[in-house]
Amino acid sequence: CSSDLWRTQKNKKALCIIGARQIGKTTIIREFAKQEYENFIEINFILDKGAEKIFEDKLDADTIIENLTAFKMQKMEPGKTLVFLDEIQECPNARCAIKFLVEDGRFDYIESGSLLGVRYKEVPSYAVGFEEIVSMYPMNFREFLRANGVQDTTFTTLQFCYENHNEVPTVMHETLLKLFATYIVVGGMPDVVQTYVDTHDI
């Protein structure tokens, strides 16, 4: 997958994941860190009061890493540590610092946030070329179907019918229409979808 490719890149950029709130950005980043790294440092610029002070001094890598280590009091091993800067739109200096942290190369960095575009103008020297920006969206209808237990065989049948201009079997057609109507109401936010899957209550 693309995250595996990013993990193994030489001279990798910071990964910047942007998207609406509550679509699962933080959850998927934590899971990725658990699988791929020995050490994981997470900073949330909304929840971690005072975190912005990490980036108030000089923006050179050594100073920032010293501040980060003092703030989190966690082990940071070069090549084995992922630093996750969540809600980074709240700390423009952190976005500026990414250039120097990426050039330093000791650790990997993932940024995540909402409304990043709104705050671009607040960044004094946005480091173009040091971020790989990925947009994340709510679940689409196919993902919603999978979450509700629709099997691969159903997708295969649908594709066959589409490619060969055949009618979709009646039971399958009616089931999918009901699920589509439900999707219109429930939407694609992962927590809401999971609640529906667990309770079937709208």
What is the predicted function of each stretch?
Residues 1-202:
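Phosphate-binding site recognition
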